């Protein structure tokens, strides 16, 4: 019996700087293959810009609400793939202050890049792209890193945990995710 996929929530557009499709091309691809749900999760990461603390570098996330929710018969979810940036499970942008909006006007109060970018998204994928953040870490520490990264309510899943090469207690992380 073949395994049929009905959704893909870890896709990228050209905004991730290593993908070559637009959101429209991804939606049409998903519709042609019978997917019911497509999640676009471009990188919320320093790897997409030379100015990682500038909100203007991430305004494509803020503008995703113009996408149709149902597009060519496919439910389109608005997401991001946020880097896990430290062994404590912190996500990119959580500690990055932003004082100017995309037009260069000052905010009346300080915001974090993470909050501004993710506040209207449907979900996040949390991923390690730089395994050096856990260099010399114990199995317990890397396990706790992944568990902590799952704690923000926007985080729906972890991304490509095997690719990072970081060992962790899979069962502990899965049990934590299930309890969320």
Segments predicted by a language model, with ranges:
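Histidine-centered catalytic micro-motifs
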Residues: 6-17, 40-45, 158-162
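Enrichment for repetitive, rod-forming helical segments
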Residues: 17-19, 167
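Extended substrate/RNA-proximal surfaces in nucleic-acid metabolism proteins
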Residues: 48-180
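Short amphipathic alpha-helical segment that frequently serves as the phosphate-/nucleotide-binding helix
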Residues: 20-24
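Catalytic phosphate/metal-binding cores of nucleic-acid and nucleotide-processing enzymes, i.e., regions
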Residues: 2-3
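Short beta-strand segments at enzyme active-site cores
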Residues: 38-43, 76-80
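Catalytic domains of carbohydrate-active enzymes, especially glycoside hydrolases
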Residues: 26-41
